[in-house]
C-alpha cells in the first residue's frame, strides 16, 4: 500500500463533530483508529513509510511525543523504526531535573517540560502529535529539544487545521498524514 492509500482508509475511520471544542471547528476524532488493531497498524505503517522515504540516509534517534495524544502512537512508531521515545509533559509531571518553556494556548499560557537527560546533544529527533492547530504546543516542544542541543528533523501529525497556520511557527519541516480542515466552519 502507498501512503495515500493508507491515508484514505484511515480518514474514512474518523468521526466528525462540528463546532467542537469551539464554534468554527470541525473536530475530526482519530480515536476510532485505535479501536481497530488493523487500522492502528496502518497508521504506524504509513508514518514509518513516510519517515523511511523522507530520511533514507539519516538515523532517527528519538521520537518526541507531546502530552497526551502524541503518547497514543508515538511509542509504537518509535519501536517500529528502532528509535527511543521521549515524552514532553505539562509542568510538574516529570521527576528529576527538567528544561521548561512557556507557550500560549488560545487565551492562556501553559508550560511544557522535558527531562534534562532524556536526549543527548546532537541526537536527531522527530516530533509527533495528533493535530497541528496553532503550532503553540509543537513549537514549545521544538524549543525544549533545542535547549537540549538536539536536531529536529521534522514534525509529524495525523492531521492539520490548515486555516490556523500552525506550521508557520515550527522550526523544521512538517508532514501531515491526513488532510484536515482547511478553513473555519461557516467561511
Swiss-Prot record:
Keywords: Cytoplasm, Glycosyltransferase, Magnesium, Metal-binding, Nucleus, Purine salvage, Transferase
Any one GO molecular-function label of the UniProt entry: adenine phosphoribosyltransferase activity
Protein's UniProt keywords contain Heme: no
Cofactors demanded by this protein: Mg(2+)
Documented EC number(s): 2.4.2.7
Pfam family, one: Pribosyltran
Binding site for AMP: 133-137
Highest taxon, organism lineage: Eukaryota
Chief localization: cytoplasm
InterPro entries: Ade_phspho_trans (IPR005764), PRibTrfase_dom (IPR000836), PRTase-like (IPR029057), UPRTase/APRTase (IPR050054)
Catalysed reaction, written as an equation: AMP + diphosphate = 5-phospho-alpha-D-ribose 1-diphosphate + adenine
Gene Ontology CC, one term: nucleus
CDD domains linked: PRTases_typeI
Similarity comment: Belongs to the purine/pyrimidine phosphoribosyltransferase family.
PANTHER family with a match to the protein in the record: ADENINE PHOSPHORIBOSYLTRANSFERASE
Described function: Catalyzes a salvage reaction resulting in the formation of AMP, that is energically less costly than de novo synthesis.
Quaternary structure and interacting proteins, as annotated: Homodimer.
Protein known as: Adenine phosphoribosyltransferase
Biological source species: Eremothecium gossypii (strain ATCC 10895 / CBS 109.51 / FGSC 9923 / NRRL Y-1056) (Yeast)
